[in-house]
Amino acid sequence: MTAEFLSLLCLGLCLGYEDEKKNEKPPKPSLHAWPSSVVEAESNVTLKCQAHSQNVTFVLRKVNDSGYKQEQSSAENEAEFPFTDLKPKDAGRYFCAYKTTASHEWSESSEHLQLVVTDKHDELEAPSMKTDTRTIFVAIFSCISILLLFLSVFIIYRCSQHSSSSEESTKRTSHSKLPEQEAAEADLSNMERVSLSTADPQGVTYAELSTSALSEAASDTTQEPPGSHEYAALKV
């Protein structure tokens, strides 16, 4: 009796464990794109969903699109979902999940993968826009440099004009002072002459002394020597 009870208890525990295991959700898978999640239009890309178990069924879904669904069974732990001739409408966020043969519950959803589909026309326009922006920047920089150069030349020219005008005014001032200096020197020489003439104690100038000396010499030559009368009396 006791043995039968124990066997039934063990059987119940095992069945309960199996049921619990079936209802347990598997861990979430991983989703990635190959060769890249950013692709050009009309090209191909493959989304790969990888699970933690083998012999599973995978499902691929798209965010904000409840009607999109792809299922795929695989004996491995990975499934591939190829996309060919991509269109802009294929862009969006994708996620995947899986379930094992022993479990009827889907696993947790994988992290969302953002698939970006670029337009070739936009890619062709992008370099031209970059080139235009660079050209505009170079043109603006050149204009600013030219303006600064002209401003520097103008400032240098104005400074040179100011210095030359200062030199000319200085020269004019010096030239205007020369006649005044000459007149002052002439007045000074006249004053010196007058002072010399007034400094003589007898009040006789150099010209008067010369005239009197000449007249005295002439009177001395006209007078006869004192011995001439005696020589005449003896001769008679």
Swiss-Prot record:
Residues 166-200, 215-236 are annotated as: Disordered. This is V-set and transmembrane domain-containing protein 1. Residues 17-135 are extracellular. One of its GO terms (biological process) is immune system process. The gene is VSTM1. GO terms for cellular component: extracellular space; plasma membrane. PROSITE patterns: IG_LIKE. Isoform 2 is N-glycosylated. It comes from the Eukaryota. It comes from Homo sapiens (Human). Residues 27-114 form the Ig-like V-type domain. Residues 157-236 are cytoplasmic. The keyword Glycoprotein applies. Keywords: Cytokine, Disulfide bond, Glycoprotein, Immunity, Immunoglobulin domain, Membrane, Secreted, Signal, Transmembrane, Transmembrane helix. It holds the Pfam family Ig_2. Contains 2 copies of a cytoplasmic motif that is referred to as the immunoreceptor tyrosine-based inhibitor motif (ITIM). This motif is involved in modulation of cellular responses. The phosphorylated ITIM motif can bind the SH2 domain of several SH2-containing phosphatases. Both motives are required for full inhibition of FCER1A-mediated degranulation. InterPro entries: Ig-like_dom, Ig-like_dom_sf, Ig-like_fold, Ig-like_Receptors_ImmuneReg, Ig_sub. Residues 1-16 form the signal peptide. Expressed on myeloid (neutrophils, eosinophils and monocytes) but not on lymphoid cells. A motif (ITIM motif 2) lies at residues 229-234. The chain crosses the membrane at residues 136-156. Glycans are attached at N44, N55. GO terms for molecular function: cytokine activity. The keyword Membrane applies. Disulfide bonds join C49-C96.
